[in-house]
Amino acid sequence: MMIAIPGVLSGRTLDHVRTLVTEAEWVDGNATSGHQSALAKKNRQLPEDGDAAREAGGIILDALGATPLFIAAALPLKVFPPLFNLYGGGERFDTHVDNAIRMKRGTDFRIRSDLSATLFLNDPDSYDGGELVVEDTLGTHKVKLGAGDMILYPASSLHHVTPVTRGERLCSFFWIQSMVRDDGARRTLFDLDTAIQAVAADRGQDDPAIIRLTGVYHNLLRRWAEA
């Protein structure tokens, strides 16, 4: 399931994150690459243990926890600390698939990467190129969202970032281990949750049918979740 999540960051919070990371020192983007990705990746990245990345990443994690659409779609168990990348002057990231297991160096923190997320931090009209292109069974999808908006997609997807030919593309990226490993099951739960909320808005949360459907949702989650 691929889903756009608008307004994860906005206003002063977005401005603060953008200021934190743009004023920091950037390094070669292969700092977090696996072998396959290192051959494909041409961009810059913030050192993951730097003060700017830690502070900005913490702000993003807090924002995710306050974003109901993200919680409903991802059913997150663990979130990898957000990283930050910068593309400009023809920089790109050729087709690759993300590593199945992500580890934070120097710690025992590791996750299974069920979902990948890209949070756009600058306006799309400030740069040319830089589209995130994701391939799935339904075809090829080009993504270039507004500042503060995020795209969530299965980490098993082949994807690439097209060359940035004008300006700079600034994003945060990270991975999520979901409580529900299977993408199809996770999609079923999301669709059911969305339908329940839509009907409840008309009939009320105390409607007997809404209560029964909510029970079905939680029983399916109980069957499929790993927590």
UniProtKB/Swiss-Prot annotation:
Keywords in alphabetical order: Dioxygenase, Iron, Metal-binding, Oxidoreductase, Vitamin C
Cofactor note: Binds 1 Fe(2+) ion per subunit.
Highest taxon listed in the record's lineage: Bacteria
Single GO MF descriptor: L-ascorbic acid binding
Record carries keyword Ribonucleoprotein: no
Residues the record lists as binding 2-oxoglutarate: 169
Protein name (Swiss-Prot/TrEMBL): PKHD-type hydroxylase Swit_4046
Organism per entry: Rhizorhabdus wittichii (strain DSM 6014 / CCUG 31198 / JCM 15750 / NBRC 105917 / EY 4224 / RW1) (Sphingomonas wittichii)
Organismal lineage: Bacteria, Pseudomonadati, Pseudomonadota, Alphaproteobacteria, Sphingomonadales
